[in-house]
Amino acid sequence: MQFPSFAEYTEALQLDLSVVLSDPLLGRGTLRTRGPGLPLARSGNFALTYEVFADGRKYALRCFHKPADALDARYDAISRHLARVRSPHFVGFQFQPAGITTESGSYPIVRMEWAEGPNLAGFVADHRHDVNALQQLRVSLRRLARHLRDNGIAHGDMQPTNLVVRDATHLTLIDYDGMFVPELGPLHSAELGQRNFQHPGRRSWHF
């Protein structure tokens, strides 16, 4: 599947959200914009992420710009595994196979709860002189690593921008495109993550 360009998503999301988005909740929402009313997007390896305010809450709208093998099956497996694990380190999300309609057709989206707080890099910069906060953060990171290992989960793109720090004791992972859960064992990784935070020998079959 060929996904829309950034420009095509920008054009579509300037229209009435209830028309271009199939999700009733997001369709009632308001998109965060910049400058002359253009949708504000954060670009990742596979998706563009937009902020939508709906029913008093904030959500992430993720629109894909790059194909990934078995995208729907991956998100379905991840969702079911996280539901069983009841992990405190992930946000709720819903994969929608025809969630947005642009000029060229209908495409999948992911609606995610918004994780509030700075990312890991921002938290460390803000607390670089706070020894207690940094020590607690170290403990929390070790606890997170143990939790993932014990539950058969690998994030796949563990880097500072994908780790939200609400406070030094509460860490939340975002961006699940490259995640591994046991059910996905037969597949290769959909992405290799930010190379500066991966083993240099990692390949797609190192899932």
Q: Predicted regions span which residues?
A:
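Conserved structural core of kinase catalytic domains
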Residues: 91-137, 186
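ATP-binding glycine-rich loop module of kinase domains
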Residues: 37-39, 45-92, 103
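Activation of the activation-loop gatekeeper triad in protein kinase-fold domains
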Residues: 175-180
